[in-house]
Amino acid sequence: MKSKFCFALSAITALTSLALSTAAHAQSQGSWLVRGGIMQLAPQVNSGTLSAPTLPGAQTSVSNSTQLAGGITYMMTNSVAIDLPLALPFKHNLYGAGSIAGVGKIGDTKAIPATVMVQYRFGEAGALFRPYLGLGITYAKFDSEHSTATLSGLTGGTPQTPTMLSIQSKIAPTLQFGGSYKIDERWFVDGAITKTPLKTRNTLSTGQTLDIELNPIGISLGVGMRF
């Protein structure tokens, strides 16, 4: 009877030690954090004017886009991490603004941001909530640009040779503020806000150009697992 009690006590002690060890090292050095969820990109547009020949004061606005997203984080120390956000391409519509406000959609594009972040996570490795700050770099690639008949009509395109749109891909810094909330010793909820000061140029096949500040704000929310 005594030997059974000692065995049970030893087992409970071992399990308790393991649980405490896991809690203490939930986001410790060497841990991998994988998450999945959604993200919205909201461009904060400051549009230049389209160069001639076109209507003076022609500008553009850009729609928000929401997509499935996630990311992978590696804890280099208990507080410093490397984060790789991941997402499907974001489709954005372009609309007339300025002197051509009200003409409707003039084009669309897919934005494919590739970002790597260095994060500093506050608090202890096993804390229930860990806010973090991140600084990184983003390569914003624009692909699958399409223009509409409206844009052709405004810029001198024809049905036979419609105006084609090209958006310059750019590299820009990205700032991040977020937080991770521990559900249990393996699962967590993660939310973050990013800001990227991004300026690019639209070039039309008819010769016009338009410089635009997109400066997108990204808002993400996901559920993740620790490994």
Regions found by a protein language model. Name each.
Residues M1-G30:
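Cleavable N-terminal export/targeting peptides
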Residues A24-G71, R226:
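Short glycine/proline- and aromatic-enriched beta-strand/turn motifs that initiate or cap beta-hairpins
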Residues H25-S31, S79, G123-R130, I183-R186:
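Short loop/turn motifs that connect adjacent beta-strands in outer-membrane beta-barrel proteins
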Residues G30, N64-L68, D108-A114, F129, ...:
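Residues that define the transmembrane beta-barrel architecture of outer-membrane proteins
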Residues Q40, Q44, G71-L151, P216-F227:
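Gram-negative (and chloroplast) outer-membrane scaffold detector with strong preference
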Residues S47-T60, F90-T109, K141-S169, T200-I212:
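Flexible, solvent-exposed loop segments that connect beta-strands
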Residues A69-T73, G178-K182:
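Short, conserved structural micro-motifs that define repeat-unit consensus positions
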Residues K91-Y95, D184-F227:
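Predominantly the C-terminal beta-signal and adjacent terminal strand-loop region
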